[in-house]
Amino acid sequence: MAHSHSGSVNYFESANKVIYEGKESTNPLAFKYYNSQEVIGGKTMKEHLRFSIAYWHTFTADGTDIFGAATMQRPWDHYKGMDLARARVDAAFELFEKLDAPFFAFHDRDIAPEGSTLKETNQNLDLIVDMIKDYMRTSGVKLLWNTANMFTNPRFVHGAATSCNADVFAYAAAQVKKGLETAKELGAENYVFWGGREGYETLLNTDLKFELDNMARFMHMAVDYAKEIGYTGQFLIEPKPKEPTTHQYDTDAATTIAFLKQYGLDNHFKLNLEANHATLAGHTFEHELRMARVHGLLGSVDANQGDPLLGWDTDEFPTDLYSATLAMYEILKNGGLGSGGLNFDAKVRRSSFEPDDLLYAHVAGMDTFARGLKAARKLIEDRVFEDVIQHRYRSFTEGIGLEIAEGRADFKTLEQYALNNQPIKNESGRQERLKAILNQYILQV
């Protein structure tokens, strides 16, 4: 049997608890910028950032890729089956404690293996959920969100809620039903829907409208069941444009918002936005965050980064200060993420295979967003962008512009104005100047 919650397990024995040592520190296992109790704008860094560790990349990923076998050296991997599942829970809560991480997130199949039947699978899940619940009680770590893996098993080859097979739709419903019960039991602050295989490869064999209708039916059923059992966490939907299907239905923030509004789901769902998925969609991360924010639908963040030179989801740990600063700017302008957080949906590189690399990676990501938070806060305090934007759009605060903004103008009055107007004069957007100022703020904090 694997160890249970006994306190005797020590999978990361070479590392002490990671503490804040300041930017002069040369200790790779110390925070240089993330000082959890430092107060910024009335909230601690811990409250602003709400860091979460992703169970799948951190404790189940083994480094396998399409060109090669597993590389990861994990001291718990000699266990099998349910013993392995238990050992991973021990390892997880040890790492949470060493990083002082307040939250974690998981797919159902990350934490417990599938059995030969759905009933057996659910029994496996119940055993591990009980163990996690014990650890949560004693550690104070909370569940940011859980979700259902409806993409790995071959039954989902044609999708889950968008499958052409009604038996698969029914199985997926049973799986999410269990997921919502798990969310309630563990006090998950959110529940995520990522349409792993909800999309298509070719329109030649696809009834696109029927699949979208079915996906909406599925989500309405989930909303109804959450109400029935009294689960009050925030529902989140996560956009991604492609991979594993050619065309994912929840392509990006704008597409997903249109879907939610079309099917009357926008009062029940917000968006869980991932940086790498924005890259795949041809957007900056801050574009996706802004799009969700202006629609009042920014819910949570999967903090990672992609490689713009590659056309697939690389899920690297976030170390780009520029992107992190602009992301935190959007989050602060949103008044925070509410029940959401910054979940490190990120994996160490295949060649970073030692257990300590998990610590180095999370320290890097946490420091990056701490620095981004401080720079973004200063930018907002100094109204760097706000004053520029206010000045740039000032023509809409008086005269004909004010008439337009207040809805008092029409095509006829605007034509009359245009006919009598002197030559139009535009002003420079001063983009380069703004980028230089942004760099200055990032470098100074």
Curated annotation (Swiss-Prot):
UniProt keyword annotations, A-Z: Carbohydrate metabolism, Cytoplasm, Isomerase, Magnesium, Metal-binding, Xylose metabolism
Active-site residues (renumbered): H107, D110
EC number annotated for this UniProt entry: 5.3.1.5
Residues engaged in binding Mg(2+) 2: E274, H277, D313, D315
UniProt main location, coarse: cytoplasm
Named cofactor requirement(s): Mg(2+)
Complex and partners: Homotetramer.
Protein name (database record): Xylose isomerase
Native organism taxonomy: Bacteria, Bacillati, Bacillota, Bacilli, Bacillales
Gene (UniProt): xylA
